[in-house]
């Protein structure tokens, strides 16, 4: 065809490597709690306490913590299930529930960072390279240069990094 450019060489050869989006198009009324919830058993909760204890006795900067540094078989199972829901299910998962009230915020940030690596590599949350972002109402007014997560504005239901499969 005259006047056209052949880009067929850029096509993906193996269709099996293209992630499916089946099930990821939904409205809230179609979802059931079991479609997106992963419950933690008692052993998994104990593993969280073990992570907290170990990081207190051998402190490392949060960004250096990796799941391989801990014996967490039950948490690994739970997070693999959550990842499967994200990758092949409705596209998001809720872990029910991390014992936030049992530990200090800094301890749970370490746990959250460590367990997040079971889902995939942790990535920057802001353009400036911020890796861990605190969602808090700072009293600022929502507008240019002020993220909604720093205000009391109601945020539209969404998932971040929706292009993760590309």
Predicted ranges, named:
Residues 70, 75-77, 137-140, 162:
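Short capping/connector residues at structural and topological boundaries
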Residues 1-81:
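Fe(II)/2-oxoglutarate
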Residues 100, 161-162:
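Short acidic/polar capping segments at secondary-structure boundaries
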Residues 21-42, 110-133:
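Short N-terminal secondary-structure initiator segments
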Residues 115, 122-160:
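Extended, Lys/Arg-enriched charged tracts that mediate electrostatic binding to polyanionic substrates
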Residues 15, 59-64, 81-87, 121-124, ...:
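Generic structural signal for short, flexible, solvent-exposed coil/loop and linker residues
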Residues 164-166:
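Conserved small/polar residues in nucleotide/adenosyl-binding loops
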Residues 68, 75-79, 84-130:
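Long, mid-chain structured domain cores
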